[in-house]
Each structure stands twice: as structure tokens, then as C-alpha cells.
Amino acid sequence: GSIDELIECAHRWPNAADVGPYIRQEDGSAYPSARAIPTLSNGIGHALLSGIWPNNPWSKAYRDNAVMDKERVAGWLSGSCLLVRWDAFCRIGGFDERYFMYMEDVDLGDRFGRAGFTNVLCPTAQITHAVGHSAGKHPESMLPAHHESAYRFQADRHPHWWQAPIRVMLWIGLKIRSVVVVGFTK
């Protein structure tokens, strides 16, 4: 089964900190579960344009071109299903508890990469994931939570005093986006 496939994949990639499966959504489509680490530019471009221009260059860069059928290294893997190497997990201090919801898997994958490990997509292992069932019903609380996590992720990666204007603009931009998007969903 899929767990056996993940274990075999982990053996093929001895430097992998985590291995994740191909994730199928309930409608049968692939969930982009292996992506690039979001930078400021592709994160902003994706956040602003993905709803009106799904294949914009920033979303493509963030989605890592959505290649989900090839065993490969990714910046991060969806936390909905992961096989994780315990020693690697302990070495980076596990999950960052400041993330309530969203981006905890992005942060984990990024920190694995910074510690010299890889994150590997193993498409021969497959699962179905009911994406966003509870989150989709409450965008007024879930979208701000997502934005808080996105801010935390980027703020942690831009911590210097001279990067304060970036953090301020990002915080303001995400607050405005939350108000606008939640307003449109009501």
C-alpha cells in the first residue's frame, strides 16, 4: 500500500527528511502537494493573481509547475500525509508551535532544507484528501488565520531591522486582502 511505497521511497532517498504521497482530491484531480518555498515575489503574485489568472508566472513558480507524477525533490510537502525521519524532525526542533493552522508544513519543509535535508514527493504512494471541508465553511476566520501564518513565515525569513518596511507592507497587504476576500465571500 501507500505506506510501503513511502518507506521504499525513503530508502531510495537517504537524505530525505520527509516523503509525501501523490494527493488526490475528492473530485479525482491532483492536489499540488509538492511545491516550491514561497518567496515574497511568488507569494504576493500568487495571492493577488491566482483567482483571476490561475496560470500566472508567480503561481507557477510557487506551485513548482505542479509536477505531481514524478518522484522528485520539492521545497515542501503537504502536511496532510507525511512520512518523517524522526532524527531530522528532532534536529530542527519539530513543528513550530506558533503556527496555529496553515503554513506549518511549509515552515517544516523549509527548515528541513535549510538543515541540509530534502523533501521528496513519492507519487507511487497515493491518498485522497478532503481538502478544506471545515476551512471552506468559515472563510471569515480561516483566511485571516492563513494570512497570519503567511506573515509569520515571511517575517521569520526577513528578520533584520532594515527589512522592517517589508514586514510592515506585508502585514498591511495581508490585512487588506483578508477584508476584501472575506467581504466577497459573504
Question: Model-flagged regions — what are they?
Answer:
Residues 21, 38-75:
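Short, flexible, basic/aromatic active-site loop/helix in glycosyltransferases
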Residues 34-40, 137-140:
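Short, hinge-like loop/turn segments at secondary-structure boundaries
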Residues 1-34:
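Conserved donor NDP-sugar-binding/catalytic core segment of glycosyltransferases
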Residues 109-185:
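Active-site-adjacent helix/loop segment of glycosyltransferases
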Residues 21-23, 79, 104, 132:
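Histidine-centered beta-alpha loop that forms part of the nucleotide-sugar donor binding/catalytic region
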Residues 33, 43, 47, 91-92, ...:
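Residues that scaffold the ATP/ADP-binding catalytic core of kinase and kinase-like folds
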Residues 4-6, 66-126:
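A short, conserved alpha-helix in the catalytic core of glycosyltransferases
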